[in-house]
Amino acid sequence: HCDGVNLTCEACQEPGGLVVPPTDAPVSSTTPYVEDTPEPPLHNFYCSKLLDLVFLLDGSYRLSEAEFEVLKAFVVGTMERLHISQKRIRVAVVEYHDGSHAYLELRARKRPSELRRIASQIKYVGSQLASTSEVLKYTLFQIFGKIDRPEASRVILLLTASQEPQRMARYFTRYLQGFKKKKVILIPVGIGPHANLKQIRLIEKQAPENKAFLLSGVDELEQRRDEIINYLCDLAPEAPAPSKPPQVAHITVSPGISGVSSPGPKRKSLVLDVVFVLEASDEVGEANFNKSKEFLEEVIQRMDVSPAGTHIAVLQYSYTVNVEYTFKEAQSKEDVLRHVREIRYQGGNRTNTGQALQYLSEHSFSPSQGDREQAPNLVYMVTGNPASDEIRRLPGDIQVVPIGVGSRANLQELERISRPITPIFIQDFE
């Protein structure tokens, strides 16, 4: 069609007059991974239902680049609180402006940490417009064109901060009707003073589940995140019970969220062999080391530590590696916590991270130290300084989650250690 001086070609129309948009493939290829090797939840509060969830991100200039970074952080933080799997929650992420750019597709068989990494690297566009109609058309035909998981709920989280020109919105209502026919729930999140309230109200009128969240700006996203997750999680059905005993010990209900009457998402207790590694160098100091211990206690309190559930081992390291607790010792929460409280700071003038990782690879995760062959191997490493020695690649069956603390933590080094899992960075030991 002709729009002013611009001639635009479109794909042929589907029955009913709707135009099928061209396919825009995700930015990254889909690398398979083993679904049965779990990545542990990063937060106590998270959702584990049958859900296909699509994030639509406004890429217009109405959000500054800094504000768009906050928007991305909200998406990544939400993903951290979802049980992402082809068997549970699948996610797609699309940035929209005058067109639509898919960064993640529902069928992407990647580790959750890799999906979050891709989402965190979405480029800021800052275009003059962001067409809600175009991205809804894209989602209707390209993402939900074929319903391959009818047992799962289908939800779109529309993160919008701008208004499209009226000429682009002529089929807006028709797309909404298409979603209703396919039983797709559309949750608009209006951000800031320029969000299109008229379109948001139209979305709400289509179905009672299409609840809108109106925010004064991106700074409210984090405050409302758990409320939004809780709402969309309640829209989805429970996953069916497994036909044979899985690696999950049991399911417990997490604490409810204040101000929300419906039950919250659920938390799994995984069967894991977990080694906690704490830096205890002179650079860290005794006071900060003790804060690392307090953090360790809080994490263990939330775990299902038991003979049949999660097993814990603890190391501290600096110039040398000190073994504080092994998998062979009593695996009850009370015993582990008592020993953690008794750990004494060792100090040392080096940060031999490579030596610590080599030790746990060769010794901690060995049958002689109580490692279980059927349990996934996970490492949480708290460090605040660059390694003093060489770090060698660990076997593929050991997943390391580094927690870098303070300005001296080496980003590139920790990313190499953790790949494909994204390291966690915090400002200080407080």
Swiss-Prot record:
Keywords: Blood coagulation, Cell adhesion, Disulfide bond, Extracellular matrix, Glycoprotein, Hemostasis, Repeat, Secreted. GO terms for molecular function: collagen binding; identical protein binding; immunoglobulin binding; integrin binding; protease binding; protein-folding chaperone binding. Transmembrane segments: none annotated. Disulfide bonds join 9-12, 47-233. One of its GO terms (cellular component) is Weibel-Palade body. Its main location: secreted. Glycans are attached at residues 6, 23, 30-31, 252, 261, 290, 349. Plasma. One of its GO terms (biological process) is positive regulation of intracellular signal transduction. The keyword Repressor does not apply. N- and O-glycosylated. It is found in: Secreted; Secreted, Extracellular space, Extracellular matrix. InterPro entries: ECM_Assembly_Org, VWA_N2, VWF_A, vWFA_dom_sf. Important in the maintenance of hemostasis, it promotes adhesion of platelets to the sites of vascular injury by forming a molecular bridge between sub-endothelial collagen matrix and platelet-surface receptor complex GPIb-IX-V. Also acts as a chaperone for coagulation factor VIII, delivering it to the site of injury, stabilizing its heterodimeric structure and protecting it from premature clearance from plasma. This is von Willebrand factor. The gene is Vwf.
